[in-house]
């Protein structure tokens, strides 16, 4: 995923059906975008087989993606299941503060069957210390603070987007989130080799950093019916 300054490599978690270590020959196509993509042909993406999109909403407690509203409206009009994501800055403010900011600017969830739970994009710091100056235990506490705040306001835990490498390096490969937080795993390869943190499988797989209609390519680990069920909660 792209921050305001850099490209990231992350995503995965949740409720799915396939073996995460097996080569994927099926699943549901989707993609993730931010203001870097500008105008997006959502109807074209839907016609080509995409059924969901994850859209950047916020970053830290000061940044709102300029195209979030238009992207969200366009995705809705095209019939795509959609949701927002928040790029974390654990060195900037508390998890609770950032979850509150995310919720105030498009990151909410409703059980309409068309809205994904919000996603926490947590990855290497594009501007400084790779783990934002936090120890593994401090990082786990920060993520929990974000997630519990989000859950208290929506009734859903957020999805967590990351890479296996970052998760191991910056959380000590914590298993604390593997039960309630769906994993969006970034791993650019023909198949998934490592699922971190005790998650039995990824819910979504960011399998490439480009997609025909913009942004990164993502695959839901299941069929269309299970994707709709996941969105509805």
Language model features with spans:
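Fungal secretory targeting signals
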Residues: 1-20
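Structural recognition of alpha->loop->beta junctions
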Residues: 103-119, 124-126, 172-201
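Functionally critical loop-and-helix segments that line ligand-binding/catalytic clefts
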Residues: 21-38, 176-233
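Aromatic-lined carbohydrate-recognition surfaces of secreted/lumenal glycan-active proteins
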Residues: 154-169
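Hydrophobic anchor at the start of a short beta-strand
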Residues: 82, 156-158, 183
């Amino acid at each position: 995923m792209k921050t305001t300054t850099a490209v990231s490599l992350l995503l995965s978690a949740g409720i799915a059906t396939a073996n995460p270590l097996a080569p994927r020959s099926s699943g549901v196509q989707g993609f993730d975008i931010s203001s870097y993509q500008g105008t997006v042909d959502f109807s074209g993406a839907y016609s080509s087989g995409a059924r969901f999109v994850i859209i950047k909403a916020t970053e830290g407690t000061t940044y709102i993606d300029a195209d979030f509203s238009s992207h969200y409206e366009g995705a809705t009009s095209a019939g795509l299941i959609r949701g927002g994501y928040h790029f974390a800055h654990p060195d900037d403010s508390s998890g609770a503060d950032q979850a509150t900011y995310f919720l105030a600017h498009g990151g909410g969830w409703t059980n309409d069957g068309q809205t994904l739970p919000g996603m926490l994009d947590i990855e290497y710091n594009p501007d400084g210390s790779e783990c934002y100056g936090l120890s593994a235990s401090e990082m786990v506490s920060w993520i929990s603070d974000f997630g519990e705040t989000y859950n208290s306001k929506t009734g859903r835990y957020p999805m967590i987007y990351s890479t296996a490498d970052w998760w191991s390096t910056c959380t000590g490969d914590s298993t604390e989130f593997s039960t309630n937080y769906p994993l969006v795993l970034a791993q650019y390869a023909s198949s998934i080799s490592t699922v971190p943190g005790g998650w039995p499988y990824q819910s979504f797989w960011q399998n490439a950093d480009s997609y025909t209609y913009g942004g990164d390519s993502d695959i839901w680990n299941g069929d269309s019916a299970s994707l709709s069920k996941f969105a509805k909660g």
